[in-house]
């Protein structure tokens, strides 16, 4: 069978000639495989009539259509579908008591959707997206497996779940106050002091959440999950913003929690995953289109198959190439000319002082800045980039430096196109194709009033 995915943000029926419908072979034969309900509405693709020729994805000027062939047996195990011609999830992982069960896969495969289902926030619709999800149907569907009792317990309130979201940068938007105040509100277990000590949050308790670093927000989110004293702990990406020592510390605490609870973890750090997980469910598919959760494997076997790109038991190739690690790193054989140099400088930011020794950067080189959190790595890079000023810092010669910030701001008021134009301005024609700039992004002309970029 074939599934059709329509990216509603990319589809612009007012700006195209309906190439997907015009060139579709079944449509030319009188079969309404692709239909436009109205003059300005997006198309509806009937998957049961699709022959999988692949013409519409190639003809769509915006790349808004994906036609994917999948085995027929997968369609019998669909767990959740967001809507017509939208992402769908196949199969579910099996929970284990007193163990850490991990999900491993690329982005956009449905791992977060799976965690939302396991937490009870999302009730699976089994592909019937037009009807209201029914918890009784979920229990009946899994009545002969461990999942049946699992869903019965969380729906009846016999077992409490708590989900640590991956979007820790959104915490300042939904929570107000200091880190201590937020932790106190979640302190159902009465173990506030213990959690603060375990997560090394003692020096951050008085800090307002709006000024907290990414690492502090991550530990705040994890600490809040610990304090709610749930029976089932679901942690979606626990290591982002944390240095290696903090990652190891968090992993140890989660292993301790798993002795008394059911723990699910989504993690991309393979070293931490290998250490913390008792079993791993691999998730494969196509980003934004569909995801398939396979049966659990040992952590070492799952990681090796993920890196190789081939699932042996399932006989499925999830990637056309393997990910290999060379024993020896890349070594340059010739010396490159110096690009930029800086002197010894000191910068004071409140109670924090950074002292930097003189150094230089050569052309065609990749320089790593290694150290624990809150030691001034970001401040050092900001000084070099000219984002932060240090009175005695001399960086010369002054070259154009592109700075990608550690924290991504989503407070920009305007469209993606307007943000891009505000950033690159007159250079937009050398960066993007003429068709995109004049026909898609700015059909009515470039904006006259510029917003500030990120």
What are these regions (language model features)?
Residues 17-39, 44, 55-72:
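Iron-sulfur cluster-binding cysteine motifs and their immediate structural context
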Residues 79-84, 89-90, 129-214, 228, ...:
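ABC-family P-loop ATPase nucleotide-binding domains
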Residues 247-259:
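Helical segment within the ABC ATPase nucleotide-binding domain
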Residues 208, 237-238, 245:
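Walker B catalytic motif
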Residues 114, 222, 250, 454:
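Hydrophobic anchor residue at the start of the ABC signature
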Residues 266-268:
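H-loop/switch region of ABC-family ATPase nucleotide-binding domains
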Residues 104-109, 370-372:
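The feature captures the beta-strand-to-loop junction immediately N-terminal to the Walker
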Residues 282-319:
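Conserved beta-strand-loop-alpha-helix hinge in the C-terminal portion
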């Amino acid at each position: 069978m074939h599934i059709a995915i329509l990216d509603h943000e990319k589809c612009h029926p007012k700006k195209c000639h309906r190439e997907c419908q015009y060139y579709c072979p079944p449509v030319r034969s009188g079969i309404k495989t692709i239909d436009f309900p109205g003059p300005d509405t997006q198309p509806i693709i009937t998957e049961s009539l699709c022959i999988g020729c692949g013409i519409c994805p190639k003809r769509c000027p915006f790349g808004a259509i994906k036609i994917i062939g999948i085995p027929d047996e997968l369609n019998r195990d669909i767990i959740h579908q967001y809507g017509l011609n939208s992402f769908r999830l196949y199969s579910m992982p099996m929970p284990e008591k007193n163990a850490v069960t991990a999900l491993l896969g690329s982005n956009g495969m449905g791992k977060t959707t799976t965690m939302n289902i396991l937490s009870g926030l999302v009730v699976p619709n089994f592909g019937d997206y037009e009807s209201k999800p029914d918890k009784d149907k979920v229990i009946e569907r899994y009545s002969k497996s461990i999942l049946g009792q699992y869903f019965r317990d969380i729906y009846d309130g016999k077992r409490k779940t708590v989900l640590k979201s991956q979007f820790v940068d959104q915490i300042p938007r939904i929570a107000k106050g200091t880190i201590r105040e937020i932790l106190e509100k979640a302190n159902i277990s009465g173990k506030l002091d213990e959690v603060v000590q375990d997560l090394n949050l003692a020096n951050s308790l008085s800090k307002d959440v709006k000024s907290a670093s990414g690492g502090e927000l991550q530990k705040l989110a994890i600490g809040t999950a610990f304090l709610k004293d749930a029976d089932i702990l679901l942690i979606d990406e626990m290591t982002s913003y944390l240095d290696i020592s903090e990652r190891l510390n968090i992993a140890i605490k989660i292993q301790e929690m798993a002795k008394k609870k059911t723990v699910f973890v989504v993690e991309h750090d393979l070293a931490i995953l290998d250490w913390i997980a008792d079993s791993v469910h691999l998730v494969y598919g196509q980003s934004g289109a569909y995801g398939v959760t396979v049966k659990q494997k040992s952590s070492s076997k799952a990681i090796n198959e993920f890196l190789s790109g081939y699932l042996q038991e399932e006989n499925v190739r999830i990637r056309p190439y393997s990910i290999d690690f060379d024993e020896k790193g890349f070594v340059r054989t010739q010396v490159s000319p110096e690009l930029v140099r800086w002197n010894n400088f000191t910068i004071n930011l409140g109670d924090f002082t950074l002292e930097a020794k003189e150094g230089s950067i050569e052309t065609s080189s990749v320089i790593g800045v290694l150290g624990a959190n809150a030691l001034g790595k970001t401040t050092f890079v900001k000084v070099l980039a000219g984002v932060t000023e240090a009175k005695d810092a001399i960086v010369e010669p002054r070259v154009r430096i592109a700075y990608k910030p550690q924290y991504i701001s989503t407070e920009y008021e305007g469209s993606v196109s307007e943000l891009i134009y505000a950033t690159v301005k007159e250079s937009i024609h050398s960066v993007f194709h003429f068709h995109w700039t004049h026909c898609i992004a700015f059909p009515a002309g470039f904006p006259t009033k510029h917003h500030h970029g990120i």
